[in-house]
Amino acid sequence: MSKSLQAIRGMNDILPAQTPTWRYLESTFAQLLESYGYSEIRLPILEFTDLFARGIGEGTDVVDKEMYTFLDRNEESLTLRPEGTAGCVRAVLEHGMTGGGQVQKLWYTGPMFRYEKPQKGRYRQFHQIGVEVFNQPGPDIDAELIVLTARLWKQLGLADAVTLQLNSLGSSEARARYRDALVAYLQQRFEQLDEDSQRRLTTNPLRILDSKNAQTQALLTDAPTLHDYLDEESRAHFEGLKARLDAVGIAYEINPKLVRGLDYYGRTVFEWVTDKLGAQGTVCAGGRYDGLVSQFGGKPTPGVGFAMGVERLVLLLETLGLVPETLNPAPHAYICAFGEAAELAALALAERLRDELPGLRLLVNAGGGSFKSQFKKADKSGARYALILGDDELAGRVVGCKPLRDDSEQQSIAWDALPERLAACLEQV
């Protein structure tokens, strides 16, 4: 096959057999978010590159290695969004949505792009559902975000498959003090660090904490911990969050090495992880970013949010057999028409039934065919009834109704009575 007729590596088609699961996940979460008072915002997938360089941070893997960046015809550097928070912050600033202390509770969904090594659960084009809250500084809103995700897991049947991990990164001043202590500790052991961690020691030392290298992790056993450097305000914020989670019975683990991969986070960070998907265990992650709005030139504005990976959640639902069987239901009926006059009548009949029976799943045979071939297609469709129109039915103003899923006899039903009779039959299913 020609390369031009193949999807780009790491960018996948989502086929009709898969889309019902996607719609189920997206609609379930959308309804949940709306019940908590969140509003949808739709954001462009292209932004100026500087937005991500300033927001995510120079020296991060995302900015240095993973962004899809190019010059447009005006020589402007543009980037396909690698995440949603920076674009959402840009939007609320551009449209004055946080002025005067306005609280904004927003959500969005769509594709993100990162040049990573494709593997199961990790792609170069991937989809996220993101949630952002502005002008709510307290631990109560941090708790709400975690509580609503816990409710989503319960609705999806995933409550026993995921674990909540928490940490506090403290204030920027506390992180700076901790960074100095960590760098001093690791510089004495520089030769024992893996190559990637050696590079990060000068660019983004906190990211060494979540290194996947076993030897580096062993070195970190006796390293200083961030909690020893937390300022009192951050410590109180974290205790307030834990108290709220305890109050609603949400279990959590404190992970002092949880730092997240984006520089804008401070204070609360959290991840929901699973051991059911191998290496790609994080299905939802987020935290607080109180300094990001001012970093973009706005007034200091508290912010907190999270994003969840749709592909990973779909994979988790499929792996655990939690995709509802009713997501792609078979048609209720299939109209078989024999002859040109019957085909015209079938079209009119179908639209009348759709008018009178909202929600009716109805297929009309297309392309003609013999009695046998049309019945074969009706049966293959999974329809419960075949509705038959031919010259005799037209002459008698009736429709043949043949049950396809049991041995019941075919009936002739008057045109005018068909909607009521068909509705009664469907109610018995």
From Swiss-Prot:
It comes from the Bacteria. Its main location: cytoplasm. Homodimer. InterPro entries: aa-tRNA-synth_II, aa-tRNA-synth_II/BPL/LPL, Anticodon-bd, Anticodon-bd_dom_sf, His-tRNA-ligase, HisRS-like_core, HisRS/HisZ. GO terms for biological process: histidyl-tRNA aminoacylation. The lineage of its organism: Bacteria, Pseudomonadati, Pseudomonadota, Gammaproteobacteria, Pseudomonadales. The keyword Nucleotide-binding applies. Its EC number is 6.1.1.21. Keywords: Aminoacyl-tRNA synthetase, ATP-binding, Cytoplasm, Ligase, Nucleotide-binding, Protein biosynthesis. Belongs to the class-II aminoacyl-tRNA synthetase family. It catalyses: tRNA(His) + L-histidine + ATP = L-histidyl-tRNA(His) + AMP + diphosphate + H(+). This is Histidine--tRNA ligase. It comes from Stutzerimonas stutzeri (strain A1501) (Pseudomonas stutzeri).
